[in-house]
Amino acid sequence: MTRIAMLGTGLIGGFYAEAIQGHRGRDRIVSVHSRGEANARAFAERHGVPRWTTDLAAAVTDPEVDVVIVALPNHLHEAAVCQAAAAGKAVLCTKPLGRDAAEAKRMLDAVERAGVFHGYLEDLVYTPKTLKAVEAVRGGAVGRVLWVRSRETHPGPHSDWFFDPEMAGGGAIIDMGCHCIEIARAFIGKHVRPVEVVCWGDTQVHPIEAEDHAIGMVRYESGAIGQFEVSWNFRGGMDLRDEVAGTDGTVWLNHWLRTGFEIFSANETAGYVAEKSESSGGWLFPVGDETKALGYVDMFTEMLDAWEQGTSPRETFYDGYVVNAIADAAYRSIASKRWEPVEIEDWRGGPTTEDDRGRREYDAEHWLIKRERLPDGRDRVILRHKATGELSQRAVSAPE
């Protein structure tokens, strides 16, 4: 049995508890920590946790604990991670890893110095749809990835600290952009270095200092673009969508709204519908199993399997550090209104090997620009001469 200490009793801690207990059949939360006694006691009762405490040090040094899960507000991550690593515990930390790259790097250094297992809990790269899509893309289904667009929008976070940039590290970018950035990396390839970022962000609705809306583009060394769209101003629920465009294909993913499960109710009697849902009447978009749909189940299954087997999980603290470095560049770009470099101290990926930007040869003299089927059954090919650059087109027999 894997014995887990849960640090944090908020919404994310509850989702984690539901996903962990019972799915592999051998994982148990044996201790929960909260800064408030009432929250700790209530969480323990709700999830069948035998012990609770308000003492962080006691929670992470408990000899009956194997794995520590950090599900605390962002400004508390570093202290919890460093104490758990010093105690020799495996550490899993929620997103974002740090409030900025410097904080994330200190946490990465702490777990690596201690030699403990570490996992970055980026659940949205573990959704069933995303896992299947990444497998298809890695298998060549869309050719070379050119562009990934990831969107997460909803009416705003569930706790007050999210709106405080000192506690959170920023606004919608650090809250949701971290999801979108890592989703794009999963499709483009985490070995491909992020080079620079351009980003717009502003506070459009809420009386706060943090940005509540942002759109950014990340340019990668391969030429691929990762685009993120995040907002705390979207009404009607939570919108989670991803798109991948490649030289040979396209992927569209819709994870939350309009997924094929819709209910209309003339009465306000539906109760809880789904995370960030704003109504319980009219057209509703329920989710059958939120912990599965949001990736929590597959994430913890993979993480805890990797811990038992002594292997690295799909997402480590290094990934969290890279995400923070990209987010830092986005914030600098908002201020400078220009492209800003992504500053990574120790890049562990590889050099880009796609040096021809995906050019396709038609014959010895021409590059193929486009091929399309005509109404008469033949194909039209549009070509560029390799030597002169001259453009031409011709109708040819369709391939059998």
Where would I find each of the regions flagged by the language model?
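C-terminal glycine/acidic-rich active-site capping loop/insertion
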Residues: 220, 243, 248-315, 340, ...
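Beta-loop-alpha module in the N-terminal Rossmann-like domain of NAD(P)-dependent dehydrogenases
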Residues: 47-110
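Hydrophobic residues in well-ordered beta-strands that form the structural core
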Residues: 13, 53, 93, 118-120, ...
